Amino acid sequence: GVIRHQDIQHGRAEGIGNPVIYVGAATGKDGIHGATFASEELNEESEAKRPAVQVGDPFMGKLVLEACLELFQCGAVISVQDMGAAGLTCSSTEMAEKGGNGMELNLDLVPQRAMDMSPYEIMLSESQERMLLVAKDGREEEVFQICRKWDVPASVVGHVISEPVLRLMHNGLSVAELPLDKLLGSCPIYERKAVASELQLSRQQQNAVDWDLPEDLGALLKEMIIVPELASKQWIYGQYDSMVRTCTSVGPGSDAAVIRIDGTEKALAMSIDGNSRYVQLDPKTGSCIAVAEASRNVVCSGGNPLALTNGLNFGNPEKPEIFWQLREAVAGICVACESLELPV
């Protein structure tokens, strides 16, 4: 969506003593280590790790979204952050660090939908549809009233403290107290081995000039255009309504989609591009080409490329060959972005 600059909400835990409020679905045992699971190889033994997969609730997500939008307008909320990867651990530490303060949480007050959850499980659960707020002291009831209106659970689970630490209480005892700089700024950086595989090197040494052309190029063309990666994608995007909210100027099938911004004379041009075969042959060059292609498509639609985000999906980075591919792809994106002066 599109938001106004004055409506942007920040994730800074400010104001010593201000309450930390948990908003959204109860915490369960689903999603524990979900972020790390996303980078693991899947095999026959992966079935045992199904609890690492988060259980979504789209309806609750919509209620949380609407409740948060109203909360931001009432003036009682100072900051907000979603509970994404690492759940409460990530949201609480990042908010406290960005605010230049610390945070104390009472895990007994965290809404839970599973019995006998340990502090470890509560802090690392990645259950969906949850937000962490810092509200102005004394205005908690305003937050609760709005949450009740939208039938969204809410509970004060802690407060902002002056010490730069994350302090956790459970069953009346302090079970953890960690300095924020050790969790965030001073955390160790991986130094992994990166090696191009023999298969990768052999692919790069192949020369298309040495290949024999088939006698019937027409038959070859027919074979190529039925390959899903090369064929028209109309059969997919034609099943979806591309005119939702009636802001679409240029729909799917063009170089880039163009969406009007209501109330202005501006529009957004967006393109998603990438050629897996190029990246497979040469991750660095292939990634450069992907950025350049997306930029050209935006330009050909009348736009000016402003920024991009990546959709990198690789295998297990603990394998030297896989890490080499990832490293080279990032380097390729970097080269293209520096050349085109595009922030990532």
Per-segment meaning from a language model:
Residues 1-343:
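Glycine/proline-enriched, intrinsically flexible loops and inter-domain linkers
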